[in-house]
Amino acid sequence: MTHQTHACHMVNPSPWPLTGALSGLLMTSGLIMWFHFNSTTLLMLGLTTNMLTMYQWWRDVIRESTFQGHHTPNVQKGLRYGMILFIISEVLFFTGFFWAFYHSSLAPTPELGGCWPPTGIHPLNPLEVPLLNTSVLLASGVSITWAHHSLMEGNRNHMLQALFITIALGVYFTLLQASEYYEAPFTISDGVYGSTFFVATGFHGLHVIIGSTFLIVCFFRQLKFHFTSSHHFGFEAAAWYWHFVDVVWLFLYVSIYWWGS
């Protein structure tokens, strides 16, 4: 039997990177098939294999960290750096959308009517559903902080209550955003305004759905006593991600909904 004399986690060979890459190929190919041939078969296959890969890969990570004790303080430090770099990459991702928006709105071309919003576009009222959405996300930021502090203090019931409230607010935000899209007087094909609006807010909405899923997993893990007051990086990463989603929305609200209208 070999003995490990270092604090690093030497990961066992895994099929999930390969199946993840193949499912990504299927999804992107499926998107092209959907756009050009109106066939969703390949896309659904890609999504299904992607979901199965994520479930099994994260199941393995939970097993290694919670039940096998491989996530030493040294490993957790590396995971924290990884999460920070991931969030930085997401910031740069959204920077591109803001750049496109400000490039188009600060110096509107004659094709847009020389004004912003472009001629013929009726923007959404920033003091109606968008303001409610802002309040909902800010409240969820407070409740996720409450959950984090409750976890660090060992108060299990308060942590579960606060986490449930955060998830409920995240789902409520998604439903509000969907209703707003349904009732919007413009579409993604309405020039540069429609493109920048729906791509920026749509990708943010996707991040809210991902963040809500992340928190739901944390909720069930907490029910199974996976987290302790000193060992809960999975939840900590979800909280960081949720705060990032909050901050991006504030920039979206001020830029696109309020100033841009």
Curated annotation (Swiss-Prot):
Compartments where located: Mitochondrion inner membrane
GO molecular function, one term: cytochrome-c oxidase activity
Principal location class: mitochondrion
EC numbers for this chain: 7.1.1.9
Membrane topology: Multi-pass membrane protein
One annotated Gene Ontology cellular component of this protein: mitochondrial inner membrane
Catalytic activity of the protein: 4 Fe(II)-[cytochrome c] + O2 + 8 H(+)(in) = 4 Fe(III)-[cytochrome c] + 2 H2O + 4 H(+)(out)
CDD domains reported in the protein's UniProt record: Cyt_c_Oxidase_III
InterPro entries: Cyt_c/ubiquinol_Oxase_su3 (IPR024791), Cyt_c_oxase_su3_dom (IPR033945), Cyt_c_oxidase-like_su3 (IPR000298), Cyt_c_oxidase_su3-like_sf (IPR035973), Cyt_c_oxidase_su3_a-hlx (IPR013833)
Oligomeric form and interacting partners: Component of the cytochrome c oxidase (complex IV, CIV), a multisubunit enzyme composed of 14 subunits. The complex is composed of a catalytic core of 3 subunits MT-CO1, MT-CO2 and MT-CO3, encoded in the mitochondrial DNA, and 11 supernumerary subunits COX4I, COX5A, COX5B, COX6A, COX6B, COX6C, COX7A, COX7B, COX7C, COX8 and NDUFA4, which are encoded in the nuclear genome.
Protein family membership: Belongs to the cytochrome c oxidase subunit 3 family.
Role of this protein: Component of the cytochrome c oxidase, the last enzyme in the mitochondrial electron transport chain which drives oxidative phosphorylation. The respiratory chain contains 3 multisubunit complexes succinate dehydrogenase (complex II, CII), ubiquinol-cytochrome c oxidoreductase (cytochrome b-c1 complex, complex III, CIII) and cytochrome c oxidase (complex IV, CIV), that cooperate to transfer electrons derived from NADH and succinate to molecular oxygen, creating an electrochemical gradient over the inner membrane that drives transmembrane transport and the ATP synthase.
Protein's UniProt name: Cytochrome c oxidase subunit 3
Encoding gene, per UniProt annotation: MT-CO3
